[in-house]
Amino acid sequence: MFSNQYIQQRIHKANSLREEGKNPYKNGLKRSLTNAAFLEKYAYVKDLEEPKDKEKCESIVGRVKLLRLMGKACFIKIEDESAILQAYVSQNELNDEFKSLKKHLEVGDIVLVKGFPFATKTGELSVHALEFHILSKTIVPLPEKFHGLSDIELRYRQRYLDLIVNPGVKDVFKKRSLIVSSVRKFFEMEGFLEVETPMMHPIPGGANARPFITYHNALEVERYLRIAPELYLKRLIVGGFEAVFEINRNFRNEGMDHSHNPEFTMIEFYWAYHTYEDLIELSKRLFDYLLKTLNLDSKIIYNDMEVDFNQTSVISYLDALETIGGISRGILEKEDRLLAYLLEQGVKVEPNLTYGKLLAEAFDHFVEHKLINPTFVTQYPIEISPLARRNDSNPNIADRFELFIAGKEIANGFSELNDPLDQLERFKNQVAEKEKGDEEAQYMDEDYVWALAHGMPPTAGQGIGIDRLVMLLTGAKSIKDVILFPAMRPVKNDFNVESGE
């Protein structure tokens, strides 16, 4: 694993430190300031002639990003999470330590420098070292600065290296953290209670998706990694909670692309005595809050598309197919005509699709990618909405919406189905679809129906994909860019890469 000649040279240097009685992985030394705090505290030191006060001693730590040896002195660029700070080490102050430094120190090593602030001839605020310690000897060379780490596969597989070499990557994940905490704060301010529900389910439910299957040794039963928390959250509404939310992982054993990862983060929230129209207004408030928190304008650019949050619209499913998709009502309202139209347009249609699923195929192909500004699409076909409430005026549609931004689904919400008999029938229909070969159809969940039979108040519920939300608000083009360790196809590891030195 460590046979590479450059790695062997570094291992030799680590062993050489040990021979000098120095631990190359020293512990217990503390910094007094972050690099950013040092730069702020001593910003007034701007001139080489500034009096040097050795009493103002600080300890800073970080990774060596640049090393310039110049005879009896050296300059070292040291990076911690907050900033890059320059250290100056001279043989005059550190005779033996300086000789050891010249012999052993390399780019990538993690160090501690204790010293006082001073400015170089060029006016750069730096640390004049009085003590120097290697805290962690790096035995694998980092990619050279000029070429960086551009191999996209390697960036995802070795995210730690990506974070070291590409500073902008840290910024994305700091923004992700801010987005998640802001979403949580928003719902707490709106009076919602954060809860946690099981990650392993006896019956997969809450979404149409293939589950991952595992085995519980103690119970001697199969369990499914959850595809959605919906049915458990609605059980809590039955139990008397009126506004709950959960931010956590879902797992779907399906394909991967730039906007899908089998393990992903969602927020789902349920609101008793409210309707899907209330959720639309709540969603608008959420985005207003996020844009303000992130200091973003109401117009953002994503994938070369201008998204204007001041141009939010609401449109029904059939109206969207007609006015945006360009399909006439005469075709949309007749199942045989719609099927013929899809085939004429070259859409690959699975055999025996229901009318509702044909409409969904048409929507996916002719509408979704055109929805750039925030668009709430309402009145979905009941056949593709097995958990949503049936509309009072038209039993063929559901009181449901999906929110699309920049051509992608961001949220799905509806007035919840709380009629246990209707829910039982719909589960039976889903089971029939599964028996016909639809692997994504939902399972029968009698326990959930039994819970509904105890009475669930009128409720609205919604899910928002956190990863896609982060993509939108950071401009990331791939979901892998906003997940620290995304799912990757297995490869044979070859760690003996050539050094960039």
UniProtKB/Swiss-Prot annotation:
Cofactor(s) required for function per UniProt: Mg(2+)
Binding site for Mg(2+) 2: 409
PROSITE patterns according to UniProt: AA_TRNA_LIGASE_II (PS50862)
Enzyme class: ligase
Keywords: Aminoacyl-tRNA synthetase, ATP-binding, Cytoplasm, Ligase, Magnesium, Metal-binding, Nucleotide-binding, Protein biosynthesis
Localization, UniProt: Cytoplasm
Keyword Ligase (UniProt): yes
Chief place where the protein resides: cytoplasm
CDD domains recorded: LysRS_core (cd00775), LysRS_N (cd04322)
GO molecular-function term, one example from the UniProt record: tRNA binding
Gene Ontology CC terms: cytosol
Cofactor binding annotation: Binds 3 Mg(2+) ions per subunit.
Family matches, as InterPro entries: Aa-tRNA-synt_II, aa-tRNA-synth_II, aa-tRNA-synth_II/BPL/LPL, Lys-tRNA-ligase_II, Lys-tRNA-ligase_II_N, Lys-tRNA-synth_II_C, NA-bd_OB-fold, NA-bd_OB_tRNA
Extent of the signal sequence: none
HAMAP family: Lys_tRNA_synth_class2
UniProt subunit comment: Homodimer.
Record's protein name: Lysine--tRNA ligase
Species of origin: Helicobacter pylori (strain G27)
